């Protein structure tokens, strides 16, 4: 009979940052007796989850993709944002063969260069500076028809902040004397990741056919009209931008389409609508044979050229476990399932040997303030069963509530989400202790601890650059080390499990045996 395993469990409370000021702080204002007691009585510390400590630009807020890559890799992983910033600064971006090849092919055939992406300074899914560089590259290489299809943010940026970005691009096109903003639409439609194809279809039709609910002469006018309709950036409806006498920007066979988002999860659905021959998310009214370029690899099964292929990461926590014949479980809801699997494994889609996965469906609601508990009850039930099964050496779980409800900007809902999490943590900690296992509780970045922007008074829907908690629950008598970061978690787990740390992991263990 096999011996029951005592699992090393990592619970990631998504968007659960640490901030001592109680003002607009959903975590502080929630009733959290369990987390309060654990923080008071167990070994704990604060760790960095943003900026240079996770391979992002200095003081850049953290995010879920970056957080999970660092958590699983056990080393600082330089993110696409930082990599692209450097490429543009050193001008190697302007000679990237995939990008220049697509532009040159369109130019020589007299075709258009379409550029789409999230027009945002948020730096989570994209950065407008990269899009600006792409526009400049297309113009420098002789493209006459340059069409920008702008997805508006308001989620990783303040809810109404797109005007200055759109103005920057309208000014740039005026300066170049060619090209224009051809369409605007909120990311709610263009960047869905939950198979809500009715939303994606509106973005697809807008770009392929130049057909939308609204049409305006300029992007700024289109945005102001959306605000007058009470639509924040994220929810701006499909709007064609075309002045009297301007050519239609509908896509044609042979045009280039360059997708400037660097984060994969919200880029996949719209990409598949453009490139998959067997696409069945919705009936496409117009199928265009485009020269489609993805900035980074959105998924291994999307077979189009990629300007910046992933750098492979050897010996992530998942791979190291598999090499040592350890069993592991990854478990989360739909919203963060990719994070505990694909991202935690360093961008590897295929599960490792001995790696099981459990996906709990996130509730089908328009926005998660309507159901702040999300699917946490079912997630906890499955997680507790896995902990007590004796089957797993390590379990990685993500609770999305703090982040997904934090993004809505609704304080009462975020408080409810945090209180729900407290109840879940109680059950998980009890289960771990009942089998003599070990538990680390942490977060990938902050969000719910800052629900209002003090400078603007608007709802704060974005992530923060604040530290996150790390708490140990288990039988070992440990002392916490200060100054940690997300990439120290994997080495910490290995140390607690009595395993060797691979040389690729440069993180340090954050608890020492007293």
Swiss-Prot record:
It is an enzyme of class 5 (isomerase). Binds 2 manganese ions per subunit. Keywords: Glycolysis, Isomerase, Manganese, Metal-binding. GO terms for biological process: glucose catabolic process; glycolytic process. Mn(2+) 1 binds at residues 403, 407, 463. GO terms for molecular function: manganese ion binding; phosphoglycerate mutase activity. Substrate binds at residues 125, 155-156, 187, 193, 263-266, 336. It catalyses: (2R)-2-phosphoglycerate = (2R)-3-phosphoglycerate. GO terms for cellular component: cytosol. Its cofactor is Mn(2+). Its EC number is 5.4.2.12. The keyword Metal-binding applies. Belongs to the BPG-independent phosphoglycerate mutase family. Catalyzes the interconversion of 2-phosphoglycerate and 3-phosphoglycerate. This is 2,3-bisphosphoglycerate-independent phosphoglycerate mutase. It comes from Enterobacter sp. (strain 638). The gene is gpmI.
């Amino acid at each position: 009979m096999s011996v029951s395993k005592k699992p090393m469990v990592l619970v990631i409370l998504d968007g659960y940052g640490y901030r001592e000021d109680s003002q607009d702080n959903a975590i502080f204002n929630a009733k959290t007796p369990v987390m309060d007691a654990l923080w008071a009585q167990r070994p704990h510390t604060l760790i960095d989850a943003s900026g240079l400590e996770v391979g992002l630009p200095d003081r850049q807020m953290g995010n879920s993709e970056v957080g999970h890559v660092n958590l699983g890799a056990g080393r600082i992983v330089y993110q696409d944002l930082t990599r692209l910033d450097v490429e543009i600064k050193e001008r190697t971006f302007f000679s990237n063969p995939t990008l220049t090849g697509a532009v040159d092919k369109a130019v020589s055939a007299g075709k258009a260069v379409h550029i789409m992406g999230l027009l945002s300074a948020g730096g989570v899914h994209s950065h407008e500076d990269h899009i600006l560089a792409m526009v400049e590259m297309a113009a420098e290489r002789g493209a006459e028809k340059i069409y920008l299809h702008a997805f508006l943010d308001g989620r990783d940026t303040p809810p109404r902040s797109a005007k200055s970005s759109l103005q920057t691009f309208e000014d740039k096109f005026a300066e170049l004397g060619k090209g224009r903003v051809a369409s605007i639409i909120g990311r709610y439609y263009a960047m869905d990741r939950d198979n809500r194809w009715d939303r994606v279809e509106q973005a697809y039709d807008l770009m392929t056919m130049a057909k939308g609910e609204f049409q305006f002469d300029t992007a700024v006018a289109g945005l102001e009209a959306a605000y007058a309709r009470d639509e924040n950036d994220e929810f701006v409806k499909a709007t064609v931008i075309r002045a009297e006498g301007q050519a239609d920007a509908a896509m044609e066979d042979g045009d280039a389409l360059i997708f400037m988002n660097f984060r994969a999860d919200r880029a996949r659905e719209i990409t598949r609508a453009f490139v998959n021959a067997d696409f069945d998310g919705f009936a496409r009214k117009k199928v265009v044979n485009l020269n489609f370029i993805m900035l980074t690899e959105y998924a291994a099964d999307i077979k189009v050229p990629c300007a910046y292929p992933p750098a492979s990461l050897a010996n992530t926590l998942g791979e190291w476990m598999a090499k040592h014949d350890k069993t592991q479980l990854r478990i989360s809801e739909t919203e963060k399932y990719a994070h505990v699997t694909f991202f935690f494994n360093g961008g590897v889609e295929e599960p490792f040997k001995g790696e099981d996965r459990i996906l709990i469906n996130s509730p089908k609601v328009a926005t998660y303030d309507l159901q702040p508990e999300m699917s946490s009850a079912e997630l906890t039930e499955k997680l507790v069963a896995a902990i007590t099964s004796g089957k797993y050496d390590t379990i990685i779980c993500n609770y999305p509530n703090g982040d997904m409800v934090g993004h809505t900007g609704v304080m009462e809902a975020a408080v409810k989400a945090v209180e729900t999490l407290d109840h879940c943590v109680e059950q998980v900690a009890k289960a771990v202790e009942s089998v003599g296992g070990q538990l680390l509780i942490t977060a990938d970045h902050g969000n719910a601890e800052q629900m209002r922007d003090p400078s603007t008074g608007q709802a704060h829907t974005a992530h923060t650059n604040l530290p996150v908690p790390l708490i140990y629950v288990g039988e070992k008598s440990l002392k916490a080390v200060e100054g940690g970061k997300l990439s120290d978690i994997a080495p910490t787990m290995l140390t607690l499990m009595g395993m060797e740390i691979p040389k690729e992991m440069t993180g340090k263990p954050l608890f020492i045996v007293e």
